[in-house]
Amino acid sequence: MAKEGVEKAEETEQMIEKETSKEPAEGGDGSHRLGDAQEMRAVVLAGFGGLNKLRLSRKAMPEPQDGELKIRVKACGLNFIDLMVRQGNIDNPPKTPLVPGFECSGIVEALGDSVKGYEIGDRVMAFVNYNAWAEVVCTPVEFVYKIPDDMSFSEAAAFPMNFVTAYTMLFEIANLREGMSVLVHSAGGGVGQAVAQLCSTVPNVTVFGTASTFKHEAIKDSVTHLFDRNADYVQEVKRISAEGVDIVLDCLCGDNTGKGLSLLKPLGTYILYGSSNMVTGETKSFFSFAKSWWQVEKVNPIKLYEENKVIAGFSLLNLLFKQGRSGLIRGVVEKLIGLYNQKKIKPVVDSLWALEEVKEAMQRIHDRGNIGKLILDVEKTPTPLMANDSTETSEAGEEEEDHEGDSENKERMPFIQ
């Protein structure tokens, strides 16, 4: 049965590969047609695993259902959660093949029935429950927001996930106020830079940040105190602030959970919003997963009570797509747009990548090499060395498997029934 399952998976991937190689005729509007169906380019994840599971393909163009908007995509945001989705390193992963991506920006091209408040031609940004990495998306109107005239599509694609996450944690959960202090990990990333900018809108807020040393020169002016992510930041923080900090924002998990809780002042709030420590190699590692959770300090509610500390979690995607809080998020977006119009915040874009360059872009995220947000620019022409339609084939015509995991320290785990 296992062999049969593998053969079926390989057959599916070969079918997708064949679809990728087809060159349909181009329509007058820039779209493509196969037969009578309009088609579009999209990044497809053929199965969970390494970068070799990604390729550029052609898919049928979606049309808006009741309450949806059809958006001609100009730019898409890349997030660390996309890397975890590719690996299948999330709870209840969807079935593959799928089109990844949760946020994009573009122009409204069509309106579904009952849609009000938007017109064809509006410039917008949007959350999408997958399917964002494509030339066209359809998404419910409650997840779509108009963007200012002076906001570029690249900035708009860098805006929703990062700034909404940062704002909700700081102001809706932790109640950031004047004179407080914040510790944020991955200070050079998209959320980290959004946190730093939002903290600057409140008087006398001290921001402690951790980041790789090569990022320090570029981001040193955005935070008050900056530490090497591999150093003993607990002692460094306590040397500056003996009591600790008011807010800890943790996207790492693992042993950083216990460290973060130990740094909280009385009435302080620790918020976990990611678990990037679970990602080491190119594919999902059961060893890294087990190690990260094993290192998480077991939280004793009585201890929280005695020390007057608060521990919380935040998942923006769950809040939007599973818990129905789109109204709350729309209010947050409106406040953020106001801050943008006042020139108090501005998305930091690390780099732009063509759809064909998605593998290289994801590798940059995996290497933690970005400062700010990586963007897929749908209209960008790929560099010649990367213009391989995001596929790799061997001489036999089969996909070449990438080397998986940490080459210097590849741990092997026994099969668990």
Swiss-Prot record:
Tell me the PROSITE patterns matching this sequence. Answer: QOR_ZETA_CRYSTAL
CDD domains, alphabetically? Answer: MDR3
Region entry Disordered: which residue ranges? 1-33, 382-417
Class of the enzyme per the UniProt entry, highest EC level = oxidoreductase
EC number(s) stated in the UniProt entry for this protein:
1.-.-.-
Bias (Basic and acidic residues): 406-417
Q: Which UniProt keywords apply?
A: Oxidoreductase, Phosphoprotein
| Biased segments, Acidic residues type | 395-405
Sites of the modification Phosphothreonine? 391, 393
Q: In this UniProt entry, which cysteines form S-S bonds?
A: none
Phosphoserine found at = 390, 394
Q: What one GO molecular function would you report for this record?
A: oxidoreductase activity
The record's family statement is: Belongs to the zinc-containing alcohol dehydrogenase family. Quinone oxidoreductase subfamily.
What name appears for this protein in its UniProt entry? Synaptic vesicle membrane protein VAT-1 homolog-like
Q: Which organism is it from?
A: Mus musculus
